[in-house]
């Protein structure tokens, strides 16, 4: 082994690897030694979670969260146990098997693996709430039969669709020009402050900010917490749709409606003192492993923007002076009506998930369904704690 890092390589003899992608390797720059360990992969065919800098995997065992061993079971999508990972508070260090308390966590994430789904209502119609057929894809393979192209006016053009047969690789798994094996989503609504965003249970969510303020604060997470090899960003409308569809599949709650976070003080996870542990009906999986606060709590702005009448970025009162990079938001066609549902896109959990097309009361499970229009150009999702039955993961307004 050379002491010159530019000349150092890896030589492996007499070892049979089924696939190097199933191994996590690290090297010691002082000694030049390389160690590799086989990483755990469940039987669902979901892509293995990618841990970014300062993220540690956790699993729930004996009524507590512990640091997971990457070589042992720590998630199981067939059992509706989605992968969880956290960024710990500064100065907190843990070893495999150590307990992690909610107070020790700064950021909490859930892994959404790449998938395609069978299109069930792709032609601007009405459809009853139903199970969505999701199939995990390997690596960055794009195996869906349907392709869609975004147009300059914010609309999209898709190839021929046959409901119940055509499949579509969910578009949330393409970020700019990069195909993704999956992405991490915050487990709870954001909290803390714009100078130090947190994502954790048992605290009041951060509210009363402009879209641009949220956007900048969430981007700054990567430097605040040292996740420098990730591209932290505010959730896009299409990413919300990807989580919603996974919830509606056999890997989540399925056709069971997600419960509403009715806490009037806007506590994440539905309350204080680890209330999220009993409020599992508010999770996308119906257990502690899913994503919370997607129904009720506070309205959640997402990066879904309606163009202005000249087909340009329309900030309205969001606080942007220039448009963000196009990869950070989904663009929609201008219209003066909030019931012009045909402006929705495949995968975003808008026009496909309507029991009554063209009606604001027509969302699945009676969720509110109102598009951005001439008065306001941004999507908000999930409803808020005081809306009652119109709240839900398919709520948009």
Indicate residue ranges for each PLM-predicted region.
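C-terminal, surface-exposed recognition/capping segments
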Residues: 21-23, 237-241, 268-271, 276-278, ...
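Extracellular/surface-associated beta-sandwich interaction domains
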Residues: 12-27, 218, 300-303
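Short aromatic-cysteine micro-motif
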Residues: 99-106, 139-294, 298
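GGW-centered surface loops in extracellular recognition modules
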Residues: 16-113, 117-122, 229-232
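Extracellular carbohydrate recognition
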Residues: 2-14
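Long, low-complexity, polar/charged, intrinsically disordered or flexibly structured peripheral segments
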Residues: 122-176, 185, 339-396
């Amino acid at each position: 082994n050379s002491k010159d890092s530019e000349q150092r390589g890896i030589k492996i003899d007499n070892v049979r690897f089924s696939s190097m992608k199933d191994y996590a390797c690290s090297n010691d720059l002082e000694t030049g030694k390389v160690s590799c360990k086989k990483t755990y992969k469940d039987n669902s065919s979901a892509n293995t979670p990618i841990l970014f800098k300062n993220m540690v995997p956790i699993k729930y065992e004996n009524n507590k969260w512990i640091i997971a061993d990457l070589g042992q079971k720590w998630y199981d999508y067939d059992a509706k146990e989605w992968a969880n990972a956290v960024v710990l508070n500064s100065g907190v260090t843990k070893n495999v098997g150590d307990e992690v308390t909610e107070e020790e966590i700064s950021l909490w994430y859930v892994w959404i693996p790449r998938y395609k789904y069978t299109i069930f209502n792709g032609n601007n119609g009405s459809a009853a709430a139903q199970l969505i057929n999701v199939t995990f894809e390997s690596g960055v393979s794009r195996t869906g039969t349907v392709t869609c192209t975004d147009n300059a006016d914010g609309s999209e053009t898709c190839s021929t669709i046959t409901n119940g047969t055509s499949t579509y690789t969910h578009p949330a798994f393409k970020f700019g020009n990069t195909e993704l094996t999956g992405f991490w989503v915050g487990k709870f609504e954001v909290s803390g402050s714009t100078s130090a965003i947190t994502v954790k249970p048992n605290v009041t969510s951060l509210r009363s900010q402009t879209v641009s303020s949220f956007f900048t604060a969430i981007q700054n997470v990567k430097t605040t917490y040292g996740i420098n090899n990730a591209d932290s960003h505010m959730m896009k409308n299409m990413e919300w749709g990807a989580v919603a569809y996974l919830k509606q599949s056999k890997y989540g709650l399925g056709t069971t409606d997600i419960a509403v976070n009715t806490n009037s003080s806007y506590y994440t996870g539905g309350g204080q003192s680890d209330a999220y542990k009993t409020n599992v009906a508010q999770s996308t999986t119906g257990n502690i492993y899913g994503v919370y606060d997607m129904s009720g709590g506070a309205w959640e702005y997402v990066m879904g923007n309606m163009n202005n009448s000249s087909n340009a970025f329309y900030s309205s009162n969001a606080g942007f002076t220039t448009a963000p990079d196009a990869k950070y938001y989904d663009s929609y066609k201008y219209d003066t009506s909030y019931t012009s549902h045909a402006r929705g896109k495949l995968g975003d959990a808008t026009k496909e998930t309507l029991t009554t097309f063209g009606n604001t009361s027509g969302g699945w499970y009676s969720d509110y369904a109102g598009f951005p229009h001439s008065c306001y150009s941004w999507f908000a999702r999930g409803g808020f704690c005081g809306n009652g039955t119109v709240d839900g993961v398919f709520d948009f307004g």
